Amino acid sequence: MSADSSPLVGSTPTGYGTLTIGTSIDPLSSSVSSVRLSGYCGSPWRVIGYHVVVWMMAGIPLLLFRWKPLWGVRLRLRPCNLAHAETLVIEIRDKEDSSWQLFTVQVQTEAIGEGSLEPSPQSQAEDGRSQAAVGAVPEGAWKDTAQLHKSEEAVSVGQKRVLRYYLFQGQRYIWIETQQAFYQVSLLDHGRSCDDVHRSRHGLSLQDQMVRKAIYGPNVISIPVKSYPQLLVDEALNPYYGFQAFSIALWLADHYYWYALCIFLISSISICLSLYKTRKQSQTLRDMVKLSMRVCVCRPGGEEEWVDSSELVPGDCLVLPQEGGLMPCDAALVAGECMVNESSLTGESIPVLKTALPEGLGPYCAETHRRHTLFCGTLILQARAYVGPHVLAVVTRTGFCTAKGGLVSSILHPRPINFKFYKHSMKFVAALSVLALLGTIYSIFILYRNRVPLNEIVIRALDLVTVVVPPALPAAMTVCTLYAQSRLRRQGIFCIHPLRINLGGKLQLVCFDKTGTLTEDGLDVMGVVPLKGQAFLPLVPEPRRLPVGPLLRALATCHALSRLQDTPVGDPMDLKMVESTGWVLEEEPAADSAFGTQVLAVMRPPLWEPQLQAMEEPPVPVSVLHRFPFSSALQRMSVVVAWPGATQPEAYVKGSPELVAGLCNPETVPTDFAQMLQSYTAAGYRVVALASKPLPTVPSLEAAQQLTRDTVEGDLSLLGLLVMRNLLKPQTTPVIQALRRTRIRAVMVTGDNLQTAVTVARGCGMVAPQEHLIIVHATHPERGQPASLEFLPMESPTAVNGVKDPDQAASYTVEPDPRSRHLALSGPTFGIIVKHFPKLLPKVLVQGTVFARMAPEQKTELVCELQKLQYCVGMCGDGANDCGALKAADVGISLSQAEASVVSPFTSSMASIECVPMVIREGRCSLDTSFSVFKYMALYSLTQFISVLILYTINTNLGDLQFLAIDLVITTTVAVLMSRTGPALVLGRVRPPGALLSVPVLSSLLLQMVLVTGVQLGGYFLTLAQPWFVPLNRTVAAPDNLPNYENTVVFSLSSFQYLILAAAVSKGAPFRRPLYTNVPFLVALALLSSVLVGLVLVPGLLQGPLALRNITDTGFKLLLLGLVTLNFVGAFMLESVLDQCLPACLRRLRPKRASKKRFKQLERELAEQPWPPLPAGPLR
């Protein structure tokens, strides 16, 4: 490692990002703890030495350097400072197992044109400071970015500015001279305020655009599609095929021509199919992400220019067509509104209304301002301009930095899986290699004793290595996950990362979103609770019967619906709310004649029916002047409306009851607000509060657009409560109960009200009736008092969404029973615990079941905190507000109609959580099958190893076609078909083991090999004892001394053993269906067994090709079949005894070791001491 190895994580200057760790360039999916970057540059003497070594060793080092590129870099280049590096070595360490991944990249340079880095005067701040400095970095840092490295070459060409950068997994990292480090290219929305984004609406000059393109690169998501010759070289130089080539050469030298030819043909066909599939997949992915179109951009001075989408850079201002179309980049909407279909990215099938980004000094963030951001790859269904002639959007991200680029990157560079099974499998292969070495030493000794020529000894000894280390093991293991992936696809569950299927079998906890996941998507309006003065009126079941007034107008206008092809579209709750009023949405891009100015939309009342309306005169249409769309973080939305005859416009706010009440004038909030809210939420209803506020007169739509959200959403007057019924899906309760029976924790993570979430949790069985539920309530530090934390029993009337009655709180007692306690808390409480009570957080997480009012980023944080406790975490949601959590989870399942989603490795087309147990059952089946296949491949290799060693002892071996029959006809057939067994129909409590190097697995391998060895040696010695036995001529080496009796007996017995072992390790329960359900596998076993029985009794036509000696003694043939039967019974008895008796014996001999997982340790601690502390006073 170079002395100049620089960490890429740490403090960074404003506007710049560090190297985002993780294979998908996503901090949320990061699984690394540190990254190091080392620089290397050219050295003439090292280059000469490099070529000498390669030439003297006949090019073999080139192959090694392809597998180990760091070796080649260190031999050819010398370590140097990063400022002068030509090649970089990136080392990424996994935080869980401390393993390192190495990557090498080339530093590239590019001359930057003479165009100015300053923007046009229109986009300058009032103080003259340039706002086009991408990322709004501190003054001077932008010029460092473009520098603006003056190299010796630059001097010779007139001091041209040269940019140094490198590309890693699609992302571009640039050299910052003043920081002496590489940083990910800064994005426009990083560190920039919303006002800065709005100032960019004038666009970039052509010169500035060219400079930025040199820095950001073209706006393309480039998928390399290699030619067939390139793919052939890559595939042929794979270590697997390198071992195959070595083996084929060895077999040819040993005169195994037929076997070598067949393996060569099979390997060639495999390579060709792999090349075709790889290229086809690359082409399909390239065609899927390829997006090239002509777009219109603004230029300074009011000009417009049509350019190719690949020319776009952050800072360009797009003019969006009214008919919509695909978005070629990520952009912030600064003028107009767009109706967008984001199903390809988030899985949200409902069109989303995007509104113009509000101005302000707050920083712009694509995630925070999702409702104002258009993402690359999404489809704009329609665009409407209200202020000005055009719908405008400022480009914020291009290429791989976009949302679509993130999806492609996650496919191209999936996050590495830290799974014990895969590590143990590598260790086991290494152990087999050691065994091969021991066998080689033994064979050398035996062959030397038998006076075999030296060249024959070398060939035979190396041949033993090809027997012990099974080259087909990776392919056999891959087949398991492919079968599982295919079965999931048939059930409507699509997986873009097949290796994650096995992780599904190890899930210990699953988080669920509520709305649309546990409950129905649609909501039914139960009624409205109006407010008169400071008192609630009785529930009005039909909102259309409300008198004309602020509450009715709020219900009719406070939404983000839009018309698409004459049909209202938008959030289902908004649709139901408006439908209950009977009002009709009309969108008028022209001026509203009734109001006298241009408006966003008009809500028209139904035909006047005096007998149904509590009103004296018919209602009038209401015009919407401005919308502040719903924000998950703010938990509310608002509109500004006006109508003919109104003296001043009004603002209507709709959102979380607790939050809206907090924004209202306390004099307008009834004293029984909390009790009224609880009466509905405790029954499982969803409650939304509505409030209003008169505003100063705004003469036009343009003036309304200047209003800030803080101005509109403050000092409100509470109007009433909208009560909606959100029913559980019929599949929810059975699934939750099934998970709990199998000891898989079910956790609810929702943005809904805490009381509603608790009611749903009890209704679906997350919290059983006899189990205690405790509310966790925290308060921020204030007035010199530290933050406090209280635990309040849910049965107590004191716990109503954090509002407590101190007179009754202390009188309630609960018998301590930690095993049946569940905690419920809100997002604000979760944030306080994370910040002020970090030591208590693990205990809260271990017992937490309901997490309500959680913002999207808090959902992600919760999943990550659970993973820190070493839970294998699943997450199931609809993909709308769960994107981060779905990506961060070990197994994320998005409920969507799309086949692939950016948010998760699994996408289910079924709209219920039934997919969760399906994924778990398939994961357990796949993992258990992987164990079986691995055991079988190891046993197959060891069985053949024993056969060869026995025959080597007498200076013979298996024949050419005998090897072919064993490896291709018998072993390959059963290894492929044994993986077809489907998953068990019911989830059990036991999880499949994750460790391959465990006592049960190793005991099974050892005892089965003892049995195999005993049967083969028994058959061999029985043959020697027969009166008709004629020893082979040991002076002649194999295969020239074939056929002989010893070979015939060993081959016949071992052939049966491959079938017996395949059947013995293919047990069904508890993770797979019974063996008899795998019909193709049983048919193959029956056919192959019949052929082998016929081969023993009546060799017939196969005797000659297989080089078998004819045994005429029928009694001896039956004796051989008796040995086979004994082997069959013994193998199954061994597996049965090991499955049923070994665990009990191990428990008696050695007490079960306590799990080292962090959450298990916490569970034991909580079981030994009463926790949490119940009302004895708050913790501070």
UniProtKB/Swiss-Prot annotation:
Mechanisms controlling activity: Accumulates in an inactive autophosphorylated state. The presence of spermine results in a dose-dependent reduction in autophosphorylation.
PROSITE patterns, per database record: ATPASE_E1_E2 (PS00154)
Outcome, altering residue 854 to R: In KRS; some patients manifest neuropathologic findings suggestive of neuronal ceroid lipofuscinosis
Residues with PTM Phosphoserine: 151
Binding site for Mg(2+): 878, 882
All ranges on the Cytoplasmic side of the membrane: 1-44, 66-235, 277-427, 485-930, 979-994, 1070-1080, 1139-1180
Tissues expressed in: Expressed in brain; protein levels are markedly increased in brain from subjects with Parkinson disease and subjects with dementia with Lewy bodies. Detected in pyramidal neurons located throughout the cingulate cortex (at protein level). In the substantia nigra, it is found in neuromelanin-positive dopaminergic neurons (at protein level).
Molecular function, one GO term: ATP hydrolysis activity
Recorded topology in the membrane: Multi-pass membrane protein
Annotated intramembrane regions: 45-65
Major localisation: membrane
Quaternary data: Interacts with MYCBP2; the interaction inhibits the ubiquitination of TSC2 by MYCBP2. Interacts with HDAC6; the interaction results in recruitment of HDAC6 to lysosomes to promote CTTN deacetylation.
Function: ATPase which acts as a lysosomal polyamine exporter with high affinity for spermine. Also stimulates cellular uptake of polyamines and protects against polyamine toxicity. Plays a role in intracellular cation homeostasis and the maintenance of neuronal integrity. Contributes to cellular zinc homeostasis. Confers cellular protection against Mn(2+) and Zn(2+) toxicity and mitochondrial stress. Required for proper lysosomal and mitochondrial maintenance. Regulates the autophagy-lysosome pathway through the control of SYT11 expression at both transcriptional and post-translational levels.
Disease annotated for this entry: Kufor-Rakeb syndrome: A rare form of autosomal recessive juvenile or early-onset, levodopa-responsive parkinsonism. In addition to typical parkinsonian signs, clinical manifestations of Kufor-Rakeb syndrome include behavioral problems, facial tremor, pyramidal tract dysfunction, supranuclear gaze palsy, and dementia.
NCBIfam families according to UniProt: ATPase_P-type, P-ATPase-V
Protein family membership: Belongs to the cation transport ATPase (P-type) (TC 3.A.3) family. Type V subfamily.
Name of the featured protein: Polyamine-transporting ATPase 13A2
